[in-house]
Amino acid sequence: MASSPKAPKSHRKFQSIYHPTRPLSLWQDNQHDQGEVRIEIIPLIDVVFCILTFFILGAVGLSRQQAISLDLPRASTGAPQMREMFMVSLDDLGQLYVEKQPVSQEQMVSALQNYHQYNPSGLIVLHASRNASYNDVVQLLDTLRTVGGDRVALATLPGDGQTPSGMNPNSFNNPNLGLPGMTPGNAFPNGANPGMSNFNNSNPGGSGAGVPNFSNTPLPGMPDANGNVSPNPGMNPGFPGGGAMSPDPNSQSPNLPGMGNTVPSAPQQ
């Protein structure tokens, strides 16, 4: 087979310079050819929730009521107040504070009047320390009530409010509380009454222990209703109804008045 004739060098150089280029094929997404723009919702939701959380925390922190650090007493019967409140604090030394700022009583009254003017239904709360003087607390409450009326409350710490197991607070006022060997209306076990025979058990409800009735029992040495005097041995004979005492003749004690004639002891040599 005969070979093709070779082109001259000049022609080959011209062909290499002006060789036509082939078009490049680029990959294109045919779905976006229509010109639609899609917004990603999930990243937008994340950003919105982050901003919302920031604003919630900022609003709660800025709107919180500020007060002095006090040792408040506890109360299990207190009810939480959710209304708008005006805080007044009283420390151990009797110093007044309004919004953590020390004020005098006149300044506090002026602040209360301004608050009551713009918030007629607002609640005035007193934060009094546990060690504050009782007189200071009462006087301050009286001052607050002159401005706020019945919208004044004491701030306390919440208590557990639980009654100990096995304890019934009404049992202390129960007259029929049963004790071993005891019955209502009798103060001694099993109805025994040592040394006393007449008890006043006429209380039908048995609300208290039996009380001895001495209305018909005369006192020793004193006349009774019939004029009789009960004997009183061993007492001073100068007393009505008293018996005579027999002193010991060998006693070294001096004569006592009202003891009768006693024989003095012979002086010792």
From Swiss-Prot:
Residue stretches spanning the membrane: 41-61
Major localization listed first in the record, in broad terms: membrane
Pfam family name, one: ExbD
Source domain of life: Bacteria
Location of the protein in the cell: Cell inner membrane
One GO cellular component term: plasma membrane
Compositionally biased tracts (Low complexity): 193-204
Name of the protein in its database record: Putative biopolymer transport protein ExbD
